[in-house]
Regions:
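Proline-centered loop/turn at the N-terminus of a beta-strand
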Residues: 88, 186-188, 259
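Short, Asp-centered acidic motifs that coordinate Mg2+ and/or phosphate
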Residues: 64, 186-188, 226
Length: 311
């Protein structure tokens, strides 16, 4: 018993330091601690889903939400119906005629300083459905890799005749903000892009990546709700959750778009759901086993025995 205790209590000076592995904390994880939980949501009108929306944001601890089809109304704007104590609503109700569309950004102002850039630093052409803001983490330091995050929520209706105008706008805004803020600026763009070609956006920087991998609408299957960001390496693979349902007391229908959630990497849970694939094999019958046995017995192995080396 005494021998066992003494062997476990090894004196510090007897430890060979050459055999000690020092585990360094990942800088990527440290930097990701300041990143928001992202959500890309197309509610197909949030007005009959307000309670469900509030519950979802609170339960999932969403910090930065991109809403594509809010269907905002001029006489009842989003900031009058969305009542999340810690969140700021950024929208632009005067960006189109008629019902539908009208993207918005809802962001946690307790964690980030929020500056609305819509039609101030970034001018939005008429008919382009986009809103912009820039976030600054409240504990940012002068040497932080992530100084600011420029955010854009977009909506491009199917077969839109303003696709080129939208792409030109995003390119112009990207260049304006990159020049204005410089080092440490990152981008997140999300929304419902339908049949918009995303390649011109991705070509703006080699660091921009589209990180959503699964269908976001199931009938018919399509990936319509991308998240494009320069922060891809700091995020886990996004999850696609069930569409937002209408409030029980409202006369509404469930959205047909799944909700996309992207969480920053951390030291505890960086694994996506288990992926499986089906592998089909042809069974080897007993008759085949007997034939193989006979072949081994009848085979002359002299050429093998005469080899000087297996190599």
């Amino acid at each position: 018993m005494n021998h066992e205790v003494s062997s476990k209590n090894v004196r510090k000076e007897n430890v060979n330091k050459d055999n000690v592995n020092i585990l360094k904390k990942s800088n990527k994880i440290i930097q990701a601690l300041d990143l928001p939980t992202l959500c890309n949501l197309n509610p197909r009108s949030v007005y009959n889903k307000v309670d469900e929306f509030h519950t979802f944001v609170e339960e999932e601890s969403v910090d930065l939400l991109f809403m594509s089809e809010s269907w905002e109304r001029e006489h009842l704007t989003l900031d009058k119906i969305i009542k999340l104590e810690d969140h700021t609503v950024i929208s632009n109700v005067s960006q189109r005629k008629g019902q539908g569309g009208r993207p918005a950004i809802i962001v946690n102002h307790k964690k980030y300083q929020v500056q609305n850039l819509t039609n101030s630093v970034v001018q939005i052409p008429w008919g382009v459905e986009a809103v912009w803001c820039v976030l600054t983490p409240k504990n940012v330091k002068h040497d932080s890799v992530i100084q600011k995050i420029a955010c854009c929520a977009i909506y491009c209706k199917p077969n839109s005749n303003r696709k080129t105008l939208l792409l030109d706008h995003i390119s112009d805004a990207f260049n304006v903000l990159s020049t204005k803020y410089g080092r440490g600026l990152h981008f997140v763009l999300a929304g419902d892009t339908n049949d918009l070609n995303l390649d011109p956006i991705l070509a703006l920087s080699p660091n921009l990546q589209q990180i959503v991998k699964n269908w976001t609408r199931m009938n018919p299957p399509a990936l319509l709700d991308p998240i494009i960001t320069t922060l891809a390496k700091f995020y886990q693979e996004p999850l696609c959750l069930e569409p937002l349902d209408a409030d029980p007391d409202k006369n509404g229908v469930k959205s047909d778009h799944r909700i996309v959630i992207a969480r920053a990497i951390n030291a505890i849970n960086n694994k996506c759901g288990r992926k499986t694939k089906q592998i089909k094999v042809r069974p080897f019958p007993q008759s085949g086993m007997e034939k193989m046995k006979s072949w081994f017995i009848d085979k002359s192995w002299e050429d093998i025995y005469e080899l000087e080396s297996a190599h």
